[in-house]
UniProtKB/Swiss-Prot annotation:
The gene coding this protein: calA
UniProt cross-references to PANTHER family, sorted A to Z: DOMAIN PROTEIN, PUTATIVE (AFU_ORTHOLOGUE AFUA_5G01990)-RELATED-RELATED, SECRETED THAUMATIN-LIKE PROTEIN CALA
Cited InterPro entries: CetA-like, Osmotin/thaumatin-like_sf
Biological source species: Emericella nidulans (strain FGSC A4 / ATCC 38163 / CBS 112.46 / NRRL 194 / M139)
Positions bearing carbohydrate: N37, N141
Disulfide bond entries: C130-C157, C135-C142
Family, as annotated: Belongs to the thaumatin family.
Entries under Pfam families matching the protein: Bys1
Name assigned to this protein: Secreted thaumatin-like protein calA
UniProt entry keywords in alphabetical sequence: Cell wall, Disulfide bond, Extracellular matrix, Germination, Glycoprotein, Secreted, Signal
Signal peptide start-end: 1-18
Subcellular location: Secreted; Secreted, Extracellular space, Extracellular matrix; Secreted, Cell wall
Induction behaviour: Expression is inhibited by PKA activity but is not subject to glucose repression. Not expressed in dormant conidia but only during germination.
Biological process per Gene Ontology, one example term: spore germination
Observed effect of gene inactivation: No visible phenotype. The double deletion of cetA and calA results in cell wall defects and lyse during germination, leading to the inhibition of germination.
Length: 171
């Protein structure tokens, strides 16, 4: 009986030590990582034809989403807010078409007094041929984010690249 326990324990330890241990990745290929550098929690919804359940993104933490396809056509919008009611949101919008990702940032539904505007945000991509976005802290009219529905801020890049949206560039 003791022999069986020793063998079982040895097997468990050998298996556990063989498993790779790595910290959570900063960004993922084929998706987007959102990093919350604000001093408050943020609330996220991934919206296609319907909204996903709300996700709380604690201060100092990150959230990852692999590219989704809208089953009813059109794109996906990750809505990012400072309150749980879903109002006053910054949006990371994307549509995956084959190997391309068409994406943009939208501040249309974001008030000028939002902590997200005060903190600033940027999108970086691990493919240097791709356009990125930087909206400086306090820039209420950032030209790199949609302010009006008829703006021209949609970008395209490889869908296999790793995209990182950093919320709170001032910290």
């Amino acid at each position: 009986m003791l022999f069986n326990k020793i063998i079982s324990l040895a097997a468990t330890l050998a298996t556990a030590s063989a498993l790779p241990f790595a910290p959570a990745p900063r960004s993922i290929s084929g998706g987007v990582t959102l990093i919350n550098n604000l001093s408050q929690d943020l609330y996220l919804w991934s919206v296609s034809g319907t909204a996903s359940p709300m996700v709380t993104l604690p201060a100092g933490q990150s959230y990852q989403e692999t590219w989704q396809i809208n089953p009813t056509g059109g794109g996906i919008s990750i809505k990012i807010g400072c309150s749980e009611d879903g109002s006053d949101v910054l949006q990371y919008e994307y549509t995956k078409v084959g190997d391309l990702l068409f994406w943009d940032m939208s501040s249309i539904d974001l008030s000028s007094g939002s902590p997200l505007v005060a903190a600033g945000f940027d999108v970086s991509i691990d493919d240097s041929s791709c356009d990125t976005v930087t909206c400086a802290p306090g820039d209420v009219n950032c030209s790199e984010s949609y302010q009006y529905p008829d703006d021209h801020n949609t970008r395209a890049c490889s869908s296999s690249a790793a995209y990182t949206l950093t919320l709170g560039t001032a910290n």
